[in-house]
Amino acid sequence: MLLITIYAIPDAIHNTNINLPSPKIWEMLSKILLNYIISPGFVSPLMVFSLCAMIVLSVFSPHSVKADTPTDNSPSLINNKQNFDFSPSLLGQKNTNIGDKISLNGRLFYVPWSQRGINGVIHTGLGDTSLRLAMGVDLLNTTNPHQQPIEWFSSEAPILNTWLTGIYRYLDITDFAQKKGWKIVINRDTLTLTTPSAGISNIRQGKQSWGDRVIIDLDRPTPWQIKYISEPPKPKVPHPPKPDDPTKPQGSQPKPLLDDLTKPQGSQPKTLPDDPTKPGKPQDKTTVTPPTQEWHITLDAQISPTLLQQKLSAGNQLKSVNIDVAGKQTRVKINIPLGWRPQVFTLANPNRLVIDIRPDFLLERNITWAPGLQWQQRYISLGKDRFPVFFLEVNLRQRGIKLRPIFTNYPQSINGTTSLLKIADKSQVAGAINAGFFNRVNQLSLGAIRFDNRWLSGPILNRGAIAWNDDGDIRIARLNLQETMITQGGSRLSVIRVNSADVQDGISRYTPEWGENYTPFSDDELIVTIEKDKVTRHNTGNTKDKMTFSIPKNGYILVLRSLPSAIEQLVIGSNVRVESETNPPEFNRFPYIVGGGPFLVQNSQVVLDAKAENFNAVYQRQTAIRSGIGKTVSGNLLIVAAHNRAGGSGPTFAEFAQIMQKMGAIEALNLDGGSSTSLYLGGELLDRPSQTAARVHNGIGVFFQP
């Protein structure tokens, strides 16, 4: 009878305006009841009774009556439709419902979310680093990756349980949301979260010895976001700024902002300096107004017309502050010195949002994010200067953690650039940092990349590199790759580059790892094709001809630049073989290598010699945001982004070497820095607003398997 009822109900009301559970749920109920009939001891009578009640409620509940079906883009679908998944797996112990978007009070944010069943109760989790950006929830220090204390208009820090996937750490907001009166509805891959309406009761401001403070009084806790908007246009100068890497072509285009990706080809990208938040220096003595930058703090709170008309004044470092209304949100627009960031936090009893404008903006953190993976933020002092440093400390010997080079397009292509956010998302990593140098014009790597024992890009210019394996062994040193072609006649020809976009006179070798084809970098190149260790073809290549040459899968090609005499030793039909070794020799046993430079620390001592790695003198003295990687005495890996000193510019190479040394690195390497610097964890950049980060070619990713 029960089975008849289950199968009859859908047919009986097929043409009515009553919502039914999904076909999968009907199938699940049928199977459970069939098990009861066949084996009553397997399924309890109480479960059968509960299932019957569920059927009645799901069919005849007033909430099941269909409204006019809106389109997928309709706000009513996002805000009103309740589509909970009661599948068997959801009521188990593992993730089922997942998505990457939340609609927060009607505004869409990219926030990973997940639902799982725990003891028969559905729990909702939001990605921790994204929740911080979307709602202003501050993550406090913890040594337990499974419990995360937070600060959000709290007198005492609530502790949220967490669960980990290979990419995200979810904070279980189920109980917290209920206490705060949040409403959660799931619609496909979007979680709709509605918080109680809030209002602003007052706005106060005051000058401080260290800067300025703005206080916004609220009648209840409410979500808030902070966003870097822009800096004013810079005046034209006769001498353009030097590139991040002087080895990059002088005619290269600057890295575009992420917004420029949507522009049609041929449009000019905006110039993005090494560090968009770097303090600007006056261009000449006539400069009166120092450069500023604009930030917006948006609150999901309404403000009265009277309070909106309140005039707010500039302060010590607060150049201007304005309030406007956008829908149900209130925006606080501030202009502050270039290189500064607002420090924003919340207080309870009464509820307040505090905006501090001060040179030392960093909120220090020490969070065990996962077993073997620690996220830290703190100031490192060098004399009177204090540098904000963001870093991950990774134990490569921890089960479930692996380190790999990551790329924009590989294995489809070795070239291409995009944001580290996109590279990390595509690679499905938990953490990452930008890594090696690259050519901005052809978007090819300039330095060592070894992946699974294959050279995707060979070392250049005696520059530093890091090597590692899955046993947790790490080695950092200056690296050279020495290859020799041995001809059938016994001649030895030196190969100066392997799979490299660094064009030098001599012989370069290009293997299938470079791609299916090779396009000449210069005119009058001699192309020698080797298949199965035998010379099979000679060709001449020129850039003007735009010709490409196939790289055989069973061999490689040799490119002779300004060395025509070598062709006489490579006779068609003759046999050749290649000898290859690294210096230091032990690098050859490591399957993974990424190049950077300069080499900073060895045996806990600073060994910086940028000249030996062919960095020019001007570049050596430059200050900029820095990316780096190091090894501690315990064998852990430090993945580091060092930003502008409080009230000043970023570190020089020498200062960065000292920073790495003070952090406990016994070996350390500088990576591509400036606008390229990006440190990623759990779906977001930790160290900078994402729109200020430039496109990069490659990175180093931390893969995590719980």
Q: Where do the model's predicted regions map?
A:
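Short alpha-helix capping/helix-loop boundary micro-motifs
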Residues: 556-569
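Zymogen propeptides
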Residues: 61-68, 202-238, 287-291, 304, ...
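Bacterial N-terminal signal peptides
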Residues: 47-58
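Signal-peptide-cleaved, periplasmic/extracellular N-terminal interaction regions immediately downstream
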Residues: 57-384, 414
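Short, Lys/Arg- and Gly-enriched loop/turn segments at beta-strand edges
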Residues: 365-368, 581-593
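Loop/turn positions that initiate beta-strands
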Residues: 570-579
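N-terminal secretory signal peptides that target proteins for export/translocation
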Residues: 1-39
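Conserved, well-ordered active-site substructure
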Residues: 442-460, 464-468, 593, 600-666, ...
